[in-house]
């Protein structure tokens, strides 16, 4: 536990605190589990929230038992966020008091095959999550192909310090494995955008656009490392031989590579209420459209079709007068709740 505490506090010194942002999490904010009789309270707005993002591919069974123990621990430790359990491992992002995060990580590392689980830490001055969800799924990151097994074979990890040299090589094909709306917010210079709506679309894109005989060296990346790691397992199965992925993902790169040496362009979309982070891992300039949940740049918000809490240039044409009226009323209720120092129940 002492080593975990040291890791958290060392990591937190690398981050400046940031405020939360309002917005749903694009299909990731469905209710999964909530303690029905909970009396625990999340830390006050004056507190600093520790955020831990983590994943580990490992062969797990007895998922229901792990779910119960994690539910109890997170309730007791006043944690909120999402933890996914599947036969292939664990994946999650959780926020709360640093002591509770320490306890959770000790518990997670006790799971079979998860001893090397290495979280990425950040902090916040406002809660990035409003619920705690512990969910059992078929996959911890959904690609839709049961034959892909990252627990048995994945590509070669590339450290952030070695990443630039790899992707600057003209013989390397660099692929962004994230969804199209994430790529739009920011990506590495020269990276290919598969233009996929979800990670489930990635295998079909590989079949249509990649060839092991032509693309002899492939380097892939994603936000925190989980999608590109699973993608390497797919490519190795398809006969690609030299397959690489960015260790710890974009967030690890932004933390460890100085901006003066960086080949990253734009901001990094994240699946919480911060929406996007800049190179210093501070909240960026993007927000989410309440209507379509697409990320919005300052230019999007300056467009005549944009109306705060109602619609944006991408969804304005499909937003009916009735929908506009409902969203305006909701925005009014949210503002009134904020004036009373309360959180609107719909947020």
Name each model feature, range by range:
Residues 12-14, 25:
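Leucine-biased recognition of intrinsically disordered, low-complexity hydrophobic segments
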